[in-house]
Amino acid sequence: ESGWKDDEIKQSKFPVLERADVLGCFDGEDLISQFAVYPLKMNIYDAVYHVGFVTSVCTYPEYTGNGIMKRLMIQGLTQMHKEGKSFALLYPYSIPLYHHLGWEIISNKISFNIKDRQIPTKVSAPGYVRRVAWDNTEFHELHSHFASITHGCLFRNALAWEEYWRWDEDDTNVAVYYNVK
């Protein structure tokens, strides 16, 4: 059996939704569409901007095509603007859909699959590498430094890290290089 059960999704997403600004549309008592935003900071050409990170965008299929999400997005973006957030970001599951809704792509994720035979067996270098948990303090500090010098990089808080790893934690390894001086 694959996929997520309703209770698993609720349990997984609740920590995000309780700390985000959530807009919803109801049909009577039933939530039929939602749009959630939580605050982050982003390095844009060496200046730090407050941004709204959009997540949990959904509408039941039988309600699509009625402009509900468009209205929720406009309301959410208007609120972000009032709060001084200069940009809204999301990771789209469908680039054509969000492009149709007026969103633009600012970056791409690149993944590499490296076979073990492509890695040198022994390389003399000072220091060592250790696998660490995704919530490792040194890893987060390293990422914060990287964000401070890298255009387009988010400064991730605990909530953003939870959201980032939510779907990949089981099959992802994090490693930190420690330089011995």
List where the protein language model places each region.
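Active-site rim helix/loop that mediates acceptor-substrate recognition in acyltransferases
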Residues: 2-44, 151-174
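Glycine-rich phosphate/pyrophosphate-binding loop shared by adenosine-nucleotide-utilizing enzymes
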Residues: 30-35, 52, 180-181
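A short, polar/charged loop-to-alpha-helix boundary motif
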Residues: 41-48, 114
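A short, internal acetyl-CoA/4′-phosphopantetheine-binding micro-motif in the GNAT/acyltransferase core
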Residues: 54-64
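Hydrophobic pocket-lining residues that define ligand/cofactor binding sites across diverse proteins
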Residues: 63, 80-81
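Conserved acetyl-CoA pyrophosphate-binding loop and the N-cap/start of the following alpha-helix
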Residues: 63-75
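Conserved active-site alpha-helix within GNAT-family acetyltransferase domains
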Residues: 82-86, 92-110
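Amide-forming acyltransferase catalytic core, primarily the GNAT-like/NAT-type
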Residues: 109-181
